[in-house]
Curated annotation (Swiss-Prot):
Recorded family membership: Belongs to the gamma-glutamyl phosphate reductase family.
Pathway as given in its UniProt record: Amino-acid biosynthesis; L-proline biosynthesis; L-glutamate 5-semialdehyde from L-glutamate: step 2/2
A GO cellular component annotation in the UniProt record: cytoplasm
Known function: Catalyzes the NADPH-dependent reduction of L-glutamate 5-phosphate into L-glutamate 5-semialdehyde and phosphate. The product spontaneously undergoes cyclization to form 1-pyrroline-5-carboxylate.
Protein name per UniProt: Gamma-glutamyl phosphate reductase
Main location: cytoplasm
Length: 419
């Protein structure tokens, strides 16, 4: 069984490699045509997608998936329309391929330039959210890359139909069928095989939790861009506008707790903790949030659960919030750089020096002053849909849009020069 699965993946890799050569020189018009055709097809076949998704949801409930995972798994007419609209927005974005990043003339007469080119074949391993299938495929096609998709087994039925629609729409426009392929297997070994497909994958992008990250660190020999995990913090400074802070904290935790840019820990300066925490915690608890606090926070609000040491490192993806009282912005920076995942961090303060210190010292892809962490998103930043939020420093950091799915090459024009 394992051998046949590995052989199937290698065959898919060969098809993807061949398709990537076609896509590298495909016109913007052709790529946009495929994206728009896919968007129309997703909407036209929405009922079939919802039916397939219902099977996944039923199986997920039987298997005991958490409410947070089921929420991420669910598709409905509105979310399918959002997927289609996302593809139309990608089609409307400028094509990064061929963009001239610089051109200069050397003393020997050589004209040296640098341009954007596709990466080639991109593999993505992701969990739960079937809308990622459409977003990732759309971005890769627009950036001239072939893509090999390995979604979570809990979303297999949903991913099958979405990937089939995308591949067929692209094929109808003249793009090789190997451009968009789904790894159609529930066997988790498929992900491990992908991590070693050096001959076919130019980069692997895993989107998932601690387990997936650990597996990638153990097994991957292909280049990897880590994305996803968001142990995000909001620090309320001694000179914060408390009304503003309360709105931001509530939004960062409650608006959509199952996503990676939701806040997981609230840090509060001791000077304002007594004034801020009682009302803040009451509002959060009223929205169903479970509060786990340090000893100092429990002295102020006794009826909250005690925080364990592991709570400071937890990405809950649920209506749970850890709370810690600290003495200074420096303590907040130290806590975040020790326990954060490099995703999104926020300070609420009217003090310019504290804001500047926080922004400069916190090691994260996105650092906010007086705004919710929930804004870390490709669409919000103006990139269109995103491949994920990179939490590493090479090759990309933060929301990965079209430009982050390209590389560069040098072009040199001469007139007979030799060295």
């Amino acid at each position: 069984m394992d051998k046949s699965l590995e052989e199937k993946l290698m065959e898919q890799g060969k098809k993807a490699k061949a398709a990537s050569r076609f896509l590298a020189t495909a016109s913007t018009t052709l790529k946009n045509e495929a994206l728009l055709k896919t968007a129309d097809a997703l909407e036209a076949q929405g009922a079939e997608i919802v039916a397939a998704n219902a099977i996944d949801l039923e199986l997920g409930e039987k298997q005991g998936l958490t409410p947070a995972l089921l929420e991420r798994l669910a598709l409905n007419e509105s979310r399918i329309k959002d997927m289609a609209q996302g593809l139309r927005e990608i089609a409307a974005l400028p094509d990064p391929v061929g963009e001239v990043l610089g051109m200069w003339r050397r003393p020997n007469g050589l004209e040296v330039g640098r341009i954007r080119t596709p990466i080639g074949v991109i593999g993505i391993i992701y969990e739960s959210r079937p809308n990622v299938t459409a977003d990732a495929a759309g971005l890769c096609l627009k950036a001239g890359n072939a893509i090999l998709l390995r979604g979570g087994e809990e979303a297999l039925n949903s991913n099958r139909i979405i990937a089939r629609i995308i591949a067929q729409s692209a094929k109808d426009c003249g793009i090789p069928e190997g451009a968009v392929q789904l790894v159609d297997s529930e066997d988790r070994q498929a992900a491990v095989y992908m991590m070693k497909m050096n001959d076919y994958l130019d980069v692997l992008i895993p989107r998932g939790g601690k387990g997936l990250k650990q597996a990638v660190l153990e097994h991957a020999s292909v280049p990897v861009i880590m994305t996803g995990m968001g142990n995000c913090h909001v620090y309320v400074d001694a000179l914060a506008d408390l009304s503003k802070a309360q709105k931001i904290v509530f939004n960062a935790k409650v608006q959509r707790p199952s996503v990676c840019n939701a806040a997981e820990t609230l840090l509060v300066n001791a000077k304002i903790a007594g004034d801020f925490l009682p009302a803040m915690i009451a509002e959060l608890k009223g929205a169903g949030v479970e509060i786990r606090g340090c000893e100092r926070s429990r002295e102020i609000v006794p009826d909250i659960l005690p925080a364990r040491e592991e709570d400071w490192d937890e990405e809950y993806l649920d209506l749970i919030l850890a709370v810690k009282v600290l003495d200074s912005v420096e303590d907040a920076i130290e806590h975040i750089n020790c326990h954060g995942t490099g995703h999104s961090e926020a300070i609420i303060s009217e003090d310019y020096s504290s804001v500047r210190r926080f922004i400069s010292a916190v090691d994260a892809a996105a650092v906010y002053a007086n705004a919710s962490t929930r804004f870390t998103d490709g669409n919000v930043f103006g990139f269109g849909a995103e491949m994920g939020i990179s939490t590493q420093k090479l090759h990309a950091r933060g929301p990965m849009g079209l430009q982050e799915l390209t590389t560069t090459k040098f072009i040199i024009y001469g007139d007979g020069q030799i060295r």
